[in-house]
Amino acid sequence: MLNSKEFVRELQLRHESAWMNPNVGSADAALAALPLTRTDVDDAEARLERFAPFIKKVFPETAGDRGLIESPLTEIENMRAWLNENEDAQFAGKLFLKRDSDLPVAGSVKARGGCYAVLKHTEDLALANRLVEMRDDYSVFATRAFRNFFSQYELHVGSTGNLGLSIGIMGAALGYRVTVHMSADARQWKKDLLRAKGVTVLEYGADYSYAVQKGRERAAEDARSYFIDDENSVDLFLGYAVAARRLKVQLAEQDIAVDDEHPLLVYIPCGVGGAPGGICFGLKQEFGDAAHVYFAEPVEAPCMLLGLASGLQNAICVQDIGLTGRTAADGLAVSRPSGFVGETVKEMVGGGFTVSDEHLFTDLHALHETERLFVEPSACAGFAGAVELSKMTDYLESSGLGAHWENAAHIVWATGGALVPEGEREKYLAN
């Protein structure tokens, strides 16, 4: 295993590499040290339940889940066999895909945090203006009167693509004026889709951090504008954390035990950190030390792992060590991590892995061939981490995971893909 200094050197060399967090402690101790608690996740979960009638009405594809924005958990035995045979993986337990790539509304994990942040702000405005009480039927938010009210307000967000889609789609459905500040990495089809929804898209020839800063500045100019801050938002974080509770139910439905003798290993693609950080926080609340969470990032944009391994969090960016931040995994093309997330998960996340763009496309193609499932490149990042961890015998032995390896359940969190146009899909699969 590499120490932190050696790992940073591997990052500079653009090698696919692994870092195991030396600071990870007990889940109880890590959670007790945080200002966020189970009560905060309770509150977020209850708010999503209140808005379910509205979501079901406006987004009928959610009717099967009663207006909840949720995705399937699918065992991918054929992909597991392919990884064992072609990438020398050593999987013994079951391998699952958490298909946030197919989340309704926005087709990515950002439908969790992004939609929740919009709904939280919406409820705050509605309560402050005495439009509703919490016991009311929230389907009233779909009426013309409510849409007219929210049209007085504007939402701003900086995004590489998927967060902008979730906030733009949900915000427009509620009647807001929405402006998405897009970095140079954003895909054209995502900009086109947002504009088709009536969202204003401002394009910048710079990276994600610059787009976020511009969004923050524009929102500050108008008292009726609200900036959804991907770098520092507690609301986004809690929206993602709710996912762990839903996952717990899905695992139980498939008779998957999670305890000390049946560890749960989860591999999550990471950009600025909000989604994987919130999910990690939620998993530790639900499963404690039986949950082992690992982040996966592109070799050119490993901002969160760089911040964690160096201990500098958001005081360092990937350009500081000679990397570009540019990657085909547009959702992960982030140069500087969230300091808020880094500080929150620094004693919870088990470690992380970097993956090349070429490897992403190999796994994207393999998933499609073996399981007939399509995800976008960034959503494949977790596979490389899962494979690498399975071969790290020293770490598995020292962490105690090796003793229960045959009982482990592995979840690769697929973060986006459902909205990718057919022409783009064909290009990805041909790459």
Predicted feature locations:
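PLP-dependent amino-acid enzyme catalytic core
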Residues: 1-431
